[in-house]
């Protein structure tokens, strides 16, 4: 790690690749091997390419990670942390104090809100909107144009760590253009169908069909999303 005159207080690891027109805030740290595309912005205190440090019993322990890749025009906001092995698409925005783990993939034009945590091995599509203080658990899939409201939480372990090494963690699957309200909880392995709507505060314990509106604790389907609310009407 060495200081660089490309930004005030900037530190760069070995073999970092920096594209044209990249802007650095104050006290940014770029770890070894990180690839930063043209026109990216790394704001004050951002840490990118951080190597993961895992507990001895972590399900992710022992796996190698590739360098972090930031696509052209991606923005890493103030004090965000992005691990090595993640891939951030062109024009994506990672909000202040957000946290993106190794092997996470975030598609072009997506937003990860302030303080949101995206765990390891998560796949987020293009143009997704993940709001403030969301927890996206490991092995979740969030498809294109999904909206997740503030404080929503996904989970992936029914046993809460009372399992052997052969146990497969199961994150949530959020299909294209579905919407999840603020404070909703999605239990391990649930799938929310295309254009479905999960009300704020719902606890989703089973799959929700495409275009269904579900609410309550536990969540129950109460009606169907109307034609006027489909994404194509709001492009």
Residues covered by each model-derived region:
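Short, basic/aromatic-enriched C-terminal tail that caps enzymatic domains
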Residues: 221-235
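Structural signal for interior beta-strand "rungs" in well-ordered beta-sheet cores
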Residues: 2-215, 220-221
């Amino acid at each position: 790690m060495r200081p660089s005159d490309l930004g005030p207080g900037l530190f760069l690891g070995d073999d970092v690749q920096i594209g044209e027109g990249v802007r650095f805030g104050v006290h940014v740290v770029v770890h070894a091997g990180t690839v930063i595309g043209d026109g990216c912005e790394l704001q004050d205190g951002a840490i990118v390419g951080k190597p993961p440090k895992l507990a001895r019993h972590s399900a992710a322990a022992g796996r190698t990670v590739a360098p972090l890749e930031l696509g052209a025009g991606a923005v890493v906001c103030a004090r965000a942390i992005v691990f090595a092995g993640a891939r951030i698409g062109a024009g994506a925005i990672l909000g202040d104090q957000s946290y993106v783990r190794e092997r996470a993939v975030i598609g072009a034009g997506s937003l990860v809100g302030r303080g949101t945590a995206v765990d390891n091995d998560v796949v987020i599509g293009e143009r997704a909107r993940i709001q403030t203080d969301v927890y996206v658990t490991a092995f979740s899939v969030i498809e294109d144009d999904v909206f997740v409201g503030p404080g929503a939480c996904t989970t992936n372990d029914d046993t809460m760590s009372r399992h052997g090494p052969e146990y497969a963690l199961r994150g949530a699957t959020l299909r294209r253009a579905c919407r999840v309200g603020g404070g909703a909880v999605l239990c391990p392995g649930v799938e929310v169908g295309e254009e479905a709507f999960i009300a704020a505060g719902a606890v989703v314990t089973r799959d929700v069909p495409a275009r269904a509106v579900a609410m309550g604790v536990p969540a129950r389907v109460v009606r169907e999303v109307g034609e006027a609310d489909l994404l194509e009407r709001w492009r």
